[in-house]
């Protein structure tokens, strides 16, 4: 596991959870491609617009876990990043939590003195939607 690539994945999680979508350019190429079940986003502006949909949730919490991959001779890191993405929302006057177990297929490159996502493919392992008891 590369600390730099794991750090990039953690920065993605923090930017998404904090809704700092205007900073996504610091971790993604302008030509970023993000795909998942039923969607494709082919540029950074498309990703920024697509991530606006997360504002429907009261909060999100992305827990980044395992990361396995390697740098290729072409200067591209290819690997997999595990994540549990929790989404808190209201349903019928109660709080609910939608959890998604994700295995991102990532391609990362060096760009402007740092690392940037070139692509992310979101593969779902499972989804769970349950009532939530909030901590006090």
Question: What residue ranges belong to the model's regions?
Answer:
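Residues at structural and domain junctions
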Residues: 9-10, 33, 55, 94
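A beta-strand edge to alpha-helix "cap/lid" segment located at domain peripheries
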Residues: 56-136
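A solvent-exposed, acidic/Ser-Thr-rich amphipathic alpha-helical stretch
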Residues: 21-84
């Amino acid at each position: 596991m590369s600390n730099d690539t794991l750090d990039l994945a953690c920065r993605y999680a923090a930017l998404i959870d904090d809704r700092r979508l205007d900073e996504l350019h610091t971790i993604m190429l302008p030509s970023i491609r993000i795909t998942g079940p039923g969607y494709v986003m082919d540029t950074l502006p498309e990703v920024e617009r697509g991530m606006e949909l997360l504002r429907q949730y009261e909060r999100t919490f992305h827990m980044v876990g395992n990361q396995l991959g390697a740098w290729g001779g072409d200067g591209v890191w290819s690997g997999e990043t595990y994540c549990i993405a929790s989404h808190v929302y209201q349903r019928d006057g109660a709080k609910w939590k939608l959890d998604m177990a994700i295995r991102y297929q990532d391609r990362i490159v060096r760009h402007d003195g740092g690392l940037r996502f070139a692509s992310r493919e979101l593969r779902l392992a499972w989804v769970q939607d349950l009532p939530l008891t909030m901590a006090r």
